[in-house]
Amino acid sequence: MGTAAEQGFRKAEFQSSLPGKAVRCGLCPRRCTIAEGKAGYCGVRRNEGGILRSLAYGHPVALQIDPIEKKPLCQFLPGSRTYSIGTFGCNLGCLFCQNSELSRGEYDPDDLGEEVRPEWLVADAVRNGCESIAFTYNEPTVFAEYALEIARCAHRAGLKTVLVSNGFITPEAAETLYPEIDAANFDMKGFSERFYKELCGGSLEPVLEAFRIFRRHGGHAEYTTLILPGKNDSLEMTDAWLDWVETCLDREVPLHFTAYHPAYRYHASPPTPPALLRTIREHAIRRGFPNIYLGNIR
């Protein structure tokens, strides 16, 4: 097996050198210290010879034309089609992950094939009548360099760009990527540090800071919470989230509450009852939030 460098994998941005050919990744709040020959937590940023390289750059594993509402975005280019792109890897470890076949695993550079250039993806989106390109399926933060080049190419072609993200990103990376994004749907996993720590292996505050940064850059944003019965379904937690939105964003922001179905490593909660989602929606509307959407109801 050749090294990532020998196979031409792209040098990653957001890195700094450490003694002994170690590197520190500055892409997400984990700021992984990565020894030579190893990958970071996400599995796709690998240290080869003291240089961090992105295995995900140029290697989409999911390409699909979707209705924009599937992201979900309900108030951005309604009725249009978006060209969805996903790679692999994630910087959170959600036990209830609904897309674990792409987000979690070990990735062999020998299995990745030839690099797919941003220009080819954008041209394919145009050929298929898409109005936007969406970075989705797995966490786009882990392929930020690829997403950034695709986004710039998309804008030159007159397309909009969409990000579907957990928001677990450093401020410096967000300040680089977010200006090139026209619309985003961000996950709000559960409005407590305990929820993020115990069920996602992350933390809440960096996510909230990412939301603030995106808002400052003026893109359209919608937010989605996957409701796990017994974990993040209380009206108290919902109110804490709504209070933050009202204070730091705007009551008019579209908020999505979606149904959980047991998946990956978490089966402690039953599927979300539709009645529970309706209760949350009615509560939010009574509080003066007009744009409340429900999803993933089977």
Which residue stretches match the model-derived regions?
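N-terminal [4Fe-4S]-dependent radical SAM core
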Residues: 1-87, 100-104
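A short alpha->loop->secondary-structure connector
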Residues: 102-114, 156
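Conserved AdoMet/S-adenosylmethionine-binding subsite of the radical SAM
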Residues: 115-272
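The canonical Cys-X-X-Cys-His
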Residues: 94-98
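Iron-sulfur-cluster electron-transfer modules
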Residues: 77-84, 91, 121-125, 132
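A generic "binding-loop/recognition-motif" signal
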Residues: 38, 90, 192
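Glycine-rich His-Gly loop
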Residues: 87-89, 137
